[in-house]
Amino acid sequence: MNMKKLATLVSAVALSATVSANAMAKDTIALVISTLNNPFFVSLKDGAQKEADKLGYNLVVLDSQNNPAKELANVQDLTVRGTKILLINPTDSDAVGNAVKMANQAKIPVITLDRQATKGDVVSHIASDNVLGGKIAGDYIAKKAGEGAKVIELQGIAGTSAARERGEGFQQAVAAHKFNVLASQPADFDRTKGLNVMQNLLTAHPDVQAVFAQNDEMALGALRALQTAGKADVMVVGFDGTPDGEKAVKDGKLAATIAQLPDQIGAKGVEVADKVLKGEKVQAKYPVDLKLVIKQ
């Protein structure tokens, strides 16, 4: 064999290997996560991974870093690689529509996790009942701080279904218990922002009695601000039931957290994806349980 033919053969083998490496195998499920810089979504990913291992699937995970543009690029990458099914936890319920539509055009079934997509076609959505969770949080505040309590709400990322729905449920409790809402302000599901926003709000509202934070990260940030200000008597209720959140409840720092089961959301996503790939019928929505976690 001459050198020219050998070089051609080597190039062909290399090209074949590259295509094989980039293409998705039939037994692969793709998961696009809003951010892995949040313990809740790490637990969701871990639950999905465990179920994928159990069912014999390879799970490919891409992190959108809370950036809709990065999310769209991730989905574009997956469509080029020929993914057979997409699990997506949106960065933003509205902005994710472009990514969902891209997958639709590529004939890739889409399943949303935790946060909904307002545009595009989704075969199934798996999430906790966030409206109910928001109401449970408000009801617990009323039980401990009383009717008409002076409260502050720390909101999540504007545009996410989780923030909207938790806020909706909390507003039901506000109306039922005649709370005096001193402020409702976004802190983007972030602990540092929760700390900074709470510090600013305390200056304007030193008479606050209770805080509802739409996730545990913001709750822990708010808690630190309150501790620094010498207001340990202000009750703080979080949402998600992250390991840090539940530990703070156990230690008597957080009054409560509404525990989601993110590992079950991730596991259910893979279970439903398996059914879709097998051509089985699936439900449009799958609810995942919530529980109120308080110090025992």
From Swiss-Prot:
Signal peptide (UniProt feature, chain positions): 1-25
GO cellular component terms, semicolon-separated: outer membrane-bounded periplasmic space
UniProtKB keywords: Periplasm, Signal, Sugar transport, Transport
Keyword DNA damage: no
Main location: periplasm
Subcellular location per the Swiss-Prot or TrEMBL entry: Periplasm
SUPFAM superfamilies with a match to the protein in the record: Periplasmic binding protein-like I
InterPro entries reported in the protein's UniProt record: Peripla_BP_I (IPR028082), SBP_2_dom (IPR025997)
GO molecular function per UniProt: monosaccharide binding
CDD domains the UniProt entry points to: PBP1_ribose_binding (cd06323)
BP term (GO), one: transmembrane transport
Entry similarity comment: Belongs to the bacterial solute-binding protein 2 family.
Protein purpose: Part of the ABC transporter complex RbsABC involved in ribose import. Binds ribose.
Matching NCBIfam families: PRK10653.1 (NF007936)
Subunit note: The complex is composed of an ATP-binding protein (RbsA), two transmembrane proteins (RbsC) and a solute-binding protein (RbsB).
Name this protein carries in UniProt: Ribose import binding protein RbsB
Annotated gene: rbsB
